[in-house]
């Protein structure tokens, strides 16, 4: 498959997914895509983190989450500036085919790859592995399901808002998972080494 064919498929799939939206659900997707909505959930998870792991391991995992978020967010900005792929809301083909923009044009000009998807999947991986690796006798399966479903919904909200193509979201999710998993495993190694 050529790059041109892949781009066309990505545009068509993204447009189809975007048009599944409607005015009834738009406020829900807007709420999910708004990072201010995430902070109460982050706070609750941090309290749970310290309760489950104690303050030393909890602090180490919290720092790993912060490092992951800064790393992923800043590198996403670098990719966007370097690759210069227009967001769907600025793409002439998408506009000509009536992309839904429920709240108008969103974000800066370039969007490859999705920082929302990368950050949320990175957070999901880092926090889930932070729990599971550092307290292996407990099962965090329910937490894992919840946090990864939340990450997927946030990523999908970016398509619904017309801010990202499906490919932007998939690459962002994979990138976040990779960086988050690597940082979580490194943190676990350091916790074991330091005998926290």
Describe the function of each predicted region.
Residues 45, 71, 75, 79, ...:
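Alpha-helical membrane-inserting segments
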Residues 65-86, 170:
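Membrane helix-loop-helix hairpins that form the core translocation module of multi-pass transporters
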Residues 46-75, 144:
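Interfacial segments of alpha-helical transmembrane regions
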Residues 100-196:
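Membrane-embedded catalytic cores of phosphoryl/pyrophosphoryl-handling enzymes
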Residues 25-29, 59-62, 137-143:
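Membrane-interface helix-boundary signature
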Residues 1-43, 76-109:
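N-terminal transmembrane-helix/juxtamembrane module of multi-pass inner/ER membrane proteins
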Residues 33-52, 63, 121:
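Hydrophobic alpha-helical transmembrane segments
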Residues 20, 24, 52, 82-90, ...:
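Membrane-interface elements of multi-pass transporters and channels
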């Amino acid at each position: 498959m050529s790059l041109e064919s892949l781009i066309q498929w990505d545009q068509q799939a993204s447009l189809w997914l975007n048009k599944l939206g409607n005015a009834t659900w738009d406020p829900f997707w807007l709420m999910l895509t708004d990072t201010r909505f995430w902070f109460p959930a982050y706070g609750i998870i941090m309290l749970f983190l310290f309760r489950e792991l104690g303050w030393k391991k909890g602090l180490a995992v919290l720092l790993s989450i912060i490092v992951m978020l800064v790393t992923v967010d800043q590198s996403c900005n670098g990719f966007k500036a370097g690759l210069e792929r227009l967001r769907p809301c600025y793409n002439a083909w998408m506009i000509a085919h009536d992309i839904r923009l429920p709240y108008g044009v969103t974000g800066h000009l370039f969007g490859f790859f999705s920082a929302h998807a990368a950050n949320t999947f990175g957070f999901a991986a880092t926090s889930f592995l932070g729990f599971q690796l550092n307290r292996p006798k407990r099962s965090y399966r329910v937490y894992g399901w919840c946090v990864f479903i939340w990450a997927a919904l946030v990523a999908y909200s970016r398509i619904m808002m017309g801010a990202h193509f499906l490919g932007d979201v998939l690459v962002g999710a994979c990138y976040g998972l990779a960086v988050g998993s690597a940082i979580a495993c490194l943190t676990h190694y350091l916790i074991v080494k330091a005998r926290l």
